[in-house]
Amino acid sequence: MVCGGAGFIGSHLVERLLADGHSVEVVDDLSTGSLANLGDARAMGGQLRFHHLDVTSLEFAELVGLRRPDVLYHFALLAPQASDNSSVMRAVPMLLSVLEAARNHGVKKVVVCIAAGLIYGEVHAKHLPVKEGRKNDAIGVPHVMAQTLIDLLGVYREKHGIEYTVLATTNVYGLRQRE
């Protein structure tokens, strides 16, 4: 199941999962994604289902219960350009909803995608390569929220056994990218 699967990065993941023979459930509210981004995935002819849902909705939790995916990809989180506090503040309830659905329905792993700059702050060339666990020297609401999201993932792993992976992306570009 790919939340944010009609977005730039999510739609590429959907194609890869289909190419690998997986059936894929895409959940997207289309607030920033587009059905056009799934055109190539639909043409592949695999098992693809689209659900126009917000991850904070009861319908989303019910869908997770019905489909019971092993892995839940949550790519509907903080975009690198997230600067307005309202969109940043929405990330926590979105992730909590995904984690609760995962906990209640036996999902084994959650994978999230967060811009590396929000996790690590600005890194100067002399500090490369960045080591995992490096303290975030960035100050601002988006950076604090990114760390909060990672902390929530850790809590759910410790308390509920839900494994997680954080993809810390940098300078992602390509087809279907918004201008």
Task: Say what each PLM segment does.
Residues 1-175:
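N-terminal Rossmann-like NAD(P)+-binding domain of SDR-like oxidoreductases, especially those catalyzing
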Residues 179:
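ATP-dependent carboxylate-amine ligase catalytic core
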